[in-house]
Design a protein with these regions (language model features):
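Basic, polyanion-binding surface patches
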Residues: 1-186
Length: 186
């Protein structure tokens, strides 16, 4: 048994010759906040494993519900046989801090530089520092607060994709917050 559900992301990478690839990753997570660091776990036989190991960088693209078919396609097809970026009609934008490109259609893109690779077994874990991120302007409110619920992000569990709820069910610390007393006449 493994932890479920998990986020599902599209990872873009580029080899030393400048060839782009995209693949789906469900084993992804935050591993540190200062400095901000993420991890992705990849099987060594995957094409993108070689690209990422060569360049020591990648970009995590958070897909929305409307990109679920492309997410699945990029997880079941190999970049060795097909140009997945072309097949999915993704628009690539050059990274700001890394040579890899990100997918413009994804509402959130996170540029990463690898700090460590841990061999685990079926997968190797790539631990990477977040260098910068790109967030769709439509996710911000007038006070510059990010509303990820507007992004319609997706998750993965036991071979199925799920959309995430659009409403918050709690707020960090709400379980211990004290209720304010009402003042008469106020």
């Amino acid at each position: 048994m493994v932890l479920n559900p998990v986020p599902v992301v599209l990872v873009t990478c580029k080899n030393l010759e400048g060839k782009d690839n995209v693949f789906t990753v469900a084993w992804v997570g935050t591993v540190c906040s200062k400095p901000p660091m993420l991890s992705i776990s990849i099987r060594p036989e995957r094409l993108s494993y070689d690209y990422i190991k060569e360049t020591m960088e990648f970009i995590i693209n958070l897909p929305s519900k409307k990109q679920t078919k492309e997410v699945d396609f990029c997880g079941v097809r190999s970049g060795r046989q097909i140009d997945k970026i072309k097949e999915c009609a993704f628009t690539l934008q050059e990274g700001e801090k890394v040579k890899s490109s990100y997918i413009k259609e994804c509402p959130v893109n996170i540029e990463c530089k690898i700090k460590d690779i841990i061999k685990l077994g079926s997968h190797d874990m790539f631990i990477a520092e977040v260098l910068c991120s790109h967030i769709d302007e439509d996710l911000f409110d007038e006070k510059d607060k990010i509303h990820f619920e507007k992004a319609n992000l997706i998750s993965y569990s036991h071979g199925e994709y799920f959309s995430l709820s659009k409403e918050a069910i709690g707020k960090f610390g709400y379980s211990v917050m004290k209720k304010r007393k009402r003042v008469k006449g106020g």
